[in-house]
A protein has these predicted regions:
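S-adenosylmethionine
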Residues: 1-201
């Protein structure tokens, strides 16, 4: 880290390109200079040459840029990764942290939806299991006037798992957003949330 998910996306894109698909250009946004430099180094080391690292705050990315697909791996409280009886984790988790993360998530969602092309898809994910950072954030931003009736939620699926099988095999928490996945932390999994959104117009 950083760059694990970006490297996986680049590898999948390269595999599709070898199979005859069009070349793909990937943009990774990182606002903190040291992490941006490390991200660029890690990507180069992994041979992910199709990736451009943009050192910018994604909340302020210019509307000039338009994207076919977006992974918004939002900063969060990390509530899905906390272990029971971990005093350090408990000390970090405060109402102030939750409020700060929730505000950032909504701003990032708003901008990502703005720069997503019609017909494009976005995956919103966090390593939190709190509704305030997950389904509530998504509903609130999608309900804003500028986004109303422009987007739809899609059921999650992977190349080897359809949505029903995915939901059957993961330890899920109850979620008020039917299309989303909220995975319960276990010995085998860290907790996380994800939902896929498509821009219809």
């Amino acid at each position: 880290a950083p760059g694990g998910k970006t490297t996986q996306i680049a590898a999948l894109a390269a595999e599709k390109a070898r199979a005859g698909a069009a070349d793909v250009r990937i943009t990774a946004c990182e606002m903190h200079a040291p992490r941006a430099e490390k991200l660029a180094y890690n990507l180069k080391r992994q041979g992910a040459h199709a990736v451009t690292v943009m050192r910018t705050d994604a909340r302020r990315i210019d509307a000039f840029f338009r994207f076919d697909h977006i992974l918004l791996d939002a900063p969060c409280t990390g509530s899905g990764t906390m272990r029971a009886h971990d005093p350090k984790a408990a000390a970090r988790f405060t109402p102030h942290l939750l409020k700060k993360c929730a505000a950032a998530q909504r701003a990032l969602l708003d901008r990502a939806l703005t720069v997503l092309k019609p017909g494009g898809t976005m995956v919103y994910s966090t390593c939190s299991i709190l509704p305030e950072e997950n389904e509530r954030a998504v509903r609130e931003v999608l309900g804003r006037k500028e986004h109303a009736d422009r987007f739809e939620l899609l059921s999650p699926a992977l190349p080897t798992f359809d949505a029903d099988r995915l939901k059957a095999e993961l330890p899920l928490l109850p979620c008020t957003m039917e299309e989303a996945l909220c995975v319960r932390p276990t010995d085998a999994y860290e907790g996380f949330f994800m939902v896929k959104i498509r821009r219809v117009r």
